[in-house]
């Protein structure tokens, strides 16, 4: 299944940890350990690591250790939303940097904005700098969550919620 996922996404490495993290909390801990071990093996020298949010990535951050590597820079792969700051990419980057003795950057923009607002935001030097770092990341740690739960947290419109339920 990992090979199929690698081929489908055209990526070098994919890892699947057995279990259902919704039913068995220790699965997220195991995912965190596996991710930390993978990072230790793959990261040599200076690296930019883009990180998404969510409870799984928060568990990964808890398993990070200084042995993962030197010269790491963690950047959020997305902005923030809602009030659950603990599971936002900015917070997870901060925790990973703290646990590994590395650096991190933040991206203080909402997840969902209009195209006009996006154009305004990217003109801001600090935001543009972080966006460039995200684009140059040589590793992305991306969680996969339940689309309906994420949409509810983001207070998605009823029309989009109906679409997600149908699909």
Where are these regions (language model features)?
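Ligand-binding beta-strand-loop-alpha-helix segment within the catalytic cores
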Residues: 3-37, 41-45, 69-167
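Gly/Ser/Thr-rich loops at beta-strand to alpha-helix junctions
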Residues: 49-59, 82, 146-148
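Distinct, well-ordered alpha-helical segments
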Residues: 62-66
